[in-house]
C-alpha cells in the first residue's frame, strides 16, 4: 500500500496538514474549483520563483494565501510592488479580498517539489539525466536527508521505447507513517517527448504529537518574509542516527 499511494495523502491527519483549510458547506464544489484555479494560476505566474507549496485559508470575506518559496524576492519585488500586483490579479479571479503571505524555504534541497522541478528544468536544458539526478541526490544528502529516491520515465536519451530508471540513496520507508516523506511529480517537455520525474525525500521521523495546523500561518503581513527555516519542524522532530 505504501509503495503505491501518494506518501503525502497517506500521512494527512497523522504528521501532515491540509493545503486547503476552510469549510465549504453547500458551496463546496465551487470553492474547491476556485482553489484549483488559484493554484494553477500561481504555479504558472510564479514559475521562476521555485514555489514549493501553496496553502489557502478562507473566512467569510477574506482569502489568505501562503506561498512557500525558496526565492521570495521574485514574488515580493522592489518595495513589494510585485506582490501588490499579484493581489489585484487574484481579486479578479475570486471577487474577494486576498491576503498573501510569503514563507521562505531555507533548505530547498530537502523540498521534493523544488528538487523535482530543478531536475525537470535541467532536462529541458539538454543536461544529461544521470548527471542531473546524481547532482540532486548529492546535494540533498549533504543537507542532512536520511534518504532520497528519484525515478525518471520516458524516452530517455531519445530511445525509441520509453522506460523508467530509478536512483536512490539512504532510506525512504514508505510504509512507516511517522516517517516524514516528501513527494513530488514534475514533467519535462523535451524534443523527444514528455519525461516524468518523481522524487521521494525522507527527512527523518516524527515522534509524539504534532500540530497539523500550517506552521507558517504566523507569517508577516503581505510581502514580508517569515524568518523560520523551511520545513519548520517542531521540537518533537528527531532524526535517527546513522548507526541505528
Curated annotation (Swiss-Prot):
CDD domains associated with the record: KH-II_30S_S3
Keyword RNA-binding found: yes
GO BP terms: translation
Pfam families per record: KH_2, Ribosomal_S3_C
Origin: domain of life: Bacteria
Matches recorded under Gene3D superfamilies: 3.30.300.20, Ribosomal protein S3, C-terminal domain
Positions of the KH type-2 domain: 38-106
GO cellular-component term (any): cytosolic small ribosomal subunit
Sample GO molecular function, one term: rRNA binding
Annotated segments matching region Disordered: 222-244
Keyword entries, A-Z: Ribonucleoprotein, Ribosomal protein, RNA-binding, rRNA-binding
Compositionally biased intervals (Basic and acidic residues): 222-235
Similarity comment: Belongs to the universal ribosomal protein uS3 family.
Subunit structure and binding partners: Part of the 30S ribosomal subunit. Forms a tight complex with proteins S10 and S14.
Function per UniProt: Binds the lower part of the 30S subunit head. Binds mRNA in the 70S ribosome, positioning it for translation.
Alphabetical list of HAMAP family matching this protein: Ribosomal_uS3_B
Name this polypeptide is given: Small ribosomal subunit protein uS3
Phylogenetic placement of the source organism: Bacteria, Pseudomonadati, Bacteroidota, Bacteroidia, Bacteroidales
